[in-house]
């Protein structure tokens, strides 16, 4: 029977994963809080102490740091000497290690964190097990991200979890532990960058990097330009988060934390042109992110307008020569890998709020057409584009989009009709192929009526109002196709 050690701080999906492993004939071992959760779920699991024959000591500081654990993980199964030594010491082989670490980054994100709290959240046993298992990836499966659970199970069930896949997991482990160690160094080193000022000149500010992950703003490589300002950093972070949602060539332009233009295309040059045309006035002085390399042709387009920051996964040498003609524009090169951090933090007086990131995307097949008229294919494309953008717009938010760009954005209004008025009045085009997208439900039918007056023929919204039928009836009255997603996307 194969053996797996499970010890996680992020308990997302661990019960379901553990149950599936037992069905695949794995014997499970665990520690502390992970074992308690599995016990409560009636998942067969043994304590790591059953492997080590040694109790957890020092409030759990020492529990897996033992030869019975690390010998079973590190043994090279192609070396008879290793296997003989395990047999002599009565040590069992460990086939899988599932570990994620104490939440150090989340802990030190609290401005009031004490030194003792920070120290207690430095994981020792977890990184040691991860590194040991990753080193021996030829024989041991190592999982650090809950997002990988399902794929691992699928491969195990198909008997296709091979060395190449284990190597890909190994790379994730060393990336994770490197980021973790970097965060510790930065915290204790006091790695903060003093900024010229904060949101306004009368406010002092500095930038604390808790992670040097190359796919974040904190880990961006600045190739040119002035120091990033407080507002640049916030806007750049918002721009990067949105552009990463797109697989096709895409461009996002942001001003004051709100998208002002989003475009997609067959090429990145087309995508930029669509984003620029979406609001050629507001993009002036904005932040632009592109999810493809900046070519000389694109650089000429970017150079022709005033931009504060340009973000891309790569700039060609020729593109850099063009863009560097403006001495102040900030050029940031960033890996467009999706950020694995699943939580976000907001400080409030006396504390801070923590929540999961709003990354959920409703599959099209789960969306419901609730009107007599169904959307055309082109209207569906417009809806899905807008639905991808609307979580990044301050509420109340209304977006108008076609199948290649946003064409009007109404952001941050105190009522939904007000947001719709702004989007409709600023729209660069309205025709049968343009969809109206709402981040929240319609409390009554007035927004739909306003949309009808402007010629809108397709609407997508979460639904959930006690007066949903009023909006549906209004849509039917005007021959509008309406889709309900069941998921809202407020942003404050």
Curated annotation (Swiss-Prot):
The keyword Hydrolase applies. The keyword Hydrolase applies. Pathway: Purine metabolism; IMP biosynthesis via de novo pathway; 5-formamido-1-(5-phospho-D-ribosyl)imidazole-4-carboxamide from 5-amino-1-(5-phospho-D-ribosyl)imidazole-4-carboxamide (10-formyl THF route): step 1/1; Purine metabolism; IMP biosynthesis via de novo pathway; IMP from 5-formamido-1-(5-phospho-D-ribosyl)imidazole-4-carboxamide: step 1/1. GO terms for cellular component: cytosol. Its EC number is 2.1.2.3, 3.5.4.10. It comes from the Bacteria. Keywords: Hydrolase, Multifunctional enzyme, Purine biosynthesis, Transferase. It catalyses: (6R)-10-formyltetrahydrofolate + 5-amino-1-(5-phospho-beta-D-ribosyl)imidazole-4-carboxamide = 5-formamido-1-(5-phospho-D-ribosyl)imidazole-4-carboxamide + (6S)-5,6,7,8-tetrahydrofolate; IMP + H2O = 5-formamido-1-(5-phospho-D-ribosyl)imidazole-4-carboxamide. One of its GO terms (biological process) is 'de novo' IMP biosynthetic process. One of its GO terms (molecular function) is phosphoribosylaminoimidazolecarboxamide formyltransferase activity. PROSITE patterns: MGS. The IMP cyclohydrolase activity resides in the N-terminal region. HAMAP family: PurH. Belongs to the PurH family. This is Bifunctional purine biosynthesis protein PurH. It comes from Staphylococcus aureus (strain Newman). The lineage of its organism: Bacteria, Bacillati, Bacillota, Bacilli, Bacillales. The gene is purH.
